[in-house]
Amino acid sequence: LFPYTTLFRSDKSIIDTELQLKDLETVESQLQKNQKIAALGNNKDAKILVNVLLAYKEVLEQGKNARSVTFESKEEQQAAHDLFLLTTKPVLYVANVDEASAKEGNEYSRRVEAIAAEEGAEVMVIAAKTEEDIAGLETYEDKQMFLEELGLEESGVNRLIKKAYALLNLETFITAGEMEVKAWTYHKGWKAPQCAGVIHTDFEKGFIRAEVIKYEDYLKYGSEAAVREAGKLGIEGKEY
């Protein structure tokens, strides 16, 4: 395990350094501009941004990721968010293992988990060859049978998508009609009008109400008309 762990740390260090240097370049450029603005007058936003940039500059010059910095005030948090630094992004490591280790992982993936834990990052295990085999099966039933034989509830691809969504604080709502069913991504905590805006900006501006069907009810009754007839269609306002 030692050579494997050393190699992973080395690769990780190279990537971290490249991203940190890019962030440092961004921070120094923004500092040069905003320190001048802050010095000219009583520009509160510029002064807040300068404080944020200086905090980031300090940790980046120490070879640390920008995500290691935390800010207490909402103004600082917003300024930090608007910089879109690469090393503030959440990290998910995907450990590719053999089929026998697809469910529980193995010693190698556990070493990756230990290293990732040092920076508060997440790890998930996936067997790429097994995923290829699953993708080659034609029916949903065949895929589920294959997964059950391996002791898995769902494919690694599905788990990866869910993990990434959770890490990015994203969720999905579905629109369904006679011609099309489509999934839409939104940020967790958004209200119905904001979600409507994902479909079209005019829907958010002119939002009045949303007709909502629970996913389980749609599967149970089979159509919007049947759900409506069963009294399971909800009408929600702007605060939903």
Listing of model-derived features with the role each one plays in the protein:
Residues 2-7:
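Short, small-residue-biased leader/transition segments that mark boundaries at the very start
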Residues 33-240:
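C-terminal-of-GTPase-core extension/linker across diverse P-loop GTPases
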Residues 13-19:
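Short, charge/polar-rich alpha-helical segments
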Residues 9-11:
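A charged helix-plus-loop insertion that forms the helical arch/lid used to bind
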Residues 24-32:
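Conserved phosphoryl-transfer catalytic core
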Residues 20-23, 49:
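Amphipathic alpha-helix face/heptad-repeat signature
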